[in-house]
């Protein structure tokens, strides 16, 4: 109502943890200064069970222990938003232009996404690969300093013996 927005962050694997941030919110609420609505934005543009869903699970687990539960909304992906795509294009285009001005030739631009086990997509129907592909297409189609056909999509961070998306 007063236009005040408070931004906090929480992590699953390191401090500040979800429960710590929630404790702080409850303390503020008791003082009459806490937000009445929470907007949860996981910092992964593309939805994946292993990232976004696990964050939602952690929040739900924390909510199940509490008496006061705020109104909340979860943004499950933002890979197609103009702000995300346009900012990505600006960053990539400016770096390419900088390299070209230094006399460097750009033969290929590789846009990488975090890797994921293939079973999550094939067996479970996870949207991650599709979201990554959409992100890749939306960015490369707007780039001014390199042709789309000189852009390649790849995945990184493979771990273990399972088959990973490529």
PLM segments and residue spans:
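Extended amphipathic ligand-handling, pore-lining, and cofactor/metal-binding catalytic surfaces
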Residues: 1-166
């Amino acid at each position: 109502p007063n236009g005040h927005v408070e931004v906090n962050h929480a992590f699953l694997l390191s401090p500040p943890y979800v429960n710590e941030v929630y404790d702080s919110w409850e303390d503020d609420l008791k003082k009459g200064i806490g937000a009445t609505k929470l907007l949860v934005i996981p910092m992964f543009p593309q939805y994946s069970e292993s990232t976004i869903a696990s964050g939602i699970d952690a929040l739900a687990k924390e909510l199940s222990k509490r008496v006061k539960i705020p109104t909340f909304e979860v943004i499950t992906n933002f890979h197609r938003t103009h702000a995300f795509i346009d900012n990505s294009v600006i960053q990539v285009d400016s770096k390419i232009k900088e390299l070209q001005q230094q006399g460097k030739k750009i033969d290929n631009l590789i846009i990488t996404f975090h890797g994921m086990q293939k079973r999550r997509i094939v067996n479970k129907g996870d949207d991650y690969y599709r979201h990554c592909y959409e992100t890749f297409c939306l960015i490369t189609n707007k780039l001014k300093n390199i042709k789309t056909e000189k852009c390649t999509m790849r995945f990184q961070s493979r771990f273990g013996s399972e088959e990973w998306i490529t």
